[in-house]
Swiss-Prot record:
UniProt cross-references to PANTHER family, sorted A to Z: 3-DEHYDROQUINATE SYNTHASE, 3-DEHYDROQUINATE SYNTHASE, CHLOROPLASTIC
Record carries keyword ATP-binding: no
Assigned keywords, A-Z: Amino-acid biosynthesis, Aromatic amino acid biosynthesis, Cobalt, Cytoplasm, Lyase, Metal-binding, NAD, Nucleotide-binding, Zinc
InterPro entries attached to this UniProt entry: Dehydroquinate_synthase, DHQ_synth_AroB, DHQ_synth_fam, DHQS/DOIS_N, DHQS_C
Organism: Pseudomonas syringae pv. syringae (strain B728a)
Note describing how the cofactor binds: Binds 1 divalent metal cation per subunit. Can use either Co(2+) or Zn(2+).
Compartment list: Cytoplasm
Any one GO MF annotation of this record: nucleotide binding
Protein family according to the UniProt entry: Belongs to the sugar phosphate cyclases superfamily. Dehydroquinate synthase family.
Protein known as: 3-dehydroquinate synthase
Substrates-to-products reaction catalysed: 7-phospho-2-dehydro-3-deoxy-D-arabino-heptonate = 3-dehydroquinate + phosphate
EC identifiers of the protein: 4.2.3.4
Length: 367
């Protein structure tokens, strides 16, 4: 087992990474403040791991709250289901809410914990690669709004993140690839040697090699923890973690939540960010193509939806948390391994990026 730490003063917390951690109560019980525990999961994950976790928490008053699975349910109505469960069971301010699932469950359970009786204890047990390397670390919680993704939420840190890498053995291939999009992101924005490592090990990662997965998770979480410790509320450097997300969120919103997985939209969105960085002369076309090839090898889409127009993108991108005073800030690559957030770019470069023929670009790479 490896343990990292998110340094936030009195609110610092550990990230435990290893195989079989779900069965080790000593990693959880020090972070549970009362006798009441609510485990929030979904209809896919609960049959696999809910009973095991309940056994690990023997002696506690455990309340299971099982939600429907999918991004389409990351909304106010489903959030109310969590509150209904907590109130009906008379959970008090010393309850602990545990998120057992992927990013959707973590975001909603965390938001519920932030709101319930103005804040109760919260623990993250992420079961997908995407949630293990990204959404479980850093305290971002929330739900989607019909007009924009993650537009309603709060910063609310967990007291511990428990990453059992064995849970990836039950993860569908498509979900695994979606998680790799966020892993690749770290190499692009802050760790080019990691990008090289990923190029050498992407096949092992897709083959569920435990050693390779552990390295990828550790390096991703270490990068995320460092950034969050420096900028918890995304007033500066933390925004660079959103490489590809402005374009990607537009894709998710336009297509309908859940049609494209978040990681799939991030991959296509990052290709657009690479294209724009190349058009600005910040990275070469060869470096752009290097990123595209890695996403392809990870089994991810690299072409935005063909029916999305420039106006579609601009409409959705106008409703983005990085918009300040009406100006859209974008995360782009100054060079491979170094990201910046900026609103200083020629409008025509953004327009050219939105109308670029990505299908032809990918076909050219195949040739």
């Amino acid at each position: 087992m490896q343990t990292l730490k998110v340094e936030l003063g009195e609110r610092s917390y550990p990230i435990h990474i290893g195989e079989g951690l779900l069965d080790q109560p000593e990693l959880l019980t020090p972070h549970i403040v009362g006798r009441q525990v609510a485990i929030v999961s979904n209809t896919t994950v609960a049959p696999l791991y809910l009973e095991r976790l309940t056994q690990t928490l023997a002696g506690y008053n455990v309340l299971p709250i099982v939600l429907p699975d999918g991004e389409a349910f990351k909304n106010w109505e489903t959030l109310q289901t969590i509150f209904d469960g907590l109130l009906t069971a008379r959970h008090d301010r010393r309850t602990t809410v545990i998120a057992l699932g992927g990013g959707v469950i973590g975001d909603m359970a965390g938001f519920a914990a932030a709101c319930y009786q103005r804040g109760v204890n919260f623990i993250q047990i992420p079961t997908t690669l995407l949630s293990q390397v990204d959404s479980s670390v850093g305290g971002k919680t929330g739900i989607n709004h019909p007009l924009g993704k993650n537009m309603v939420g709060a910063f609310y840190q967990p007291s511990v993140v428990l990453i059992d890498t064995a849970s990836l053995n039950t993860l569908p291939e498509r979900e695994l690839s979606a998680g790799l999009a966020e892993v690749i992101k770290y190499g692009l924005i802050c760790d080019e040697p990691f990008l090289t490592w990923l190029e050498e090990h992407v096949d092992a990662l897709r083959g569920l090699d435990q050693a390779a997965l552990t390295v990828a998770i550790e390096r991703s979480c270490a990068a995320k923890a460092l950034v969050v410790g420096a900028d918890e509320r995304e007033s500066g450097v933390r925004a660079t973690l959103n490489l590809g997300h402005t374009f990607g969120h537009a894709i998710e919103t336009h297509m309908g939540y859940g049609v494209w997985l978040h990681g799939e939209a991030v991959a296509a969105g990052t290709v657009m960010a690479l294209e724009m960085s190349s058009r600005l002369g910040w990275i070469s076309t060869q470096e752009r193509d290097r990123g595209i090839r890695l996403f392809q090898r990870a089994g991810l889409p690299v072409v935005p939806p063909q029916d999305m127009t420039q106006d579609n993108f601009l409409e959705h991108m106008a409703i983005d948390k990085k918009v300040i005073d009406g100006r859209l800030r974008l995360v782009l690559l100054r060079r491979m391994g170094e990201a910046v957030i900026t609103d200083e770019y020629p409008k025509e470069v953004l327009q050219a990026t939105l109308v670029a023929d990505y299908r032809a670009l990918v076909d050219q790479l195949r040739g």
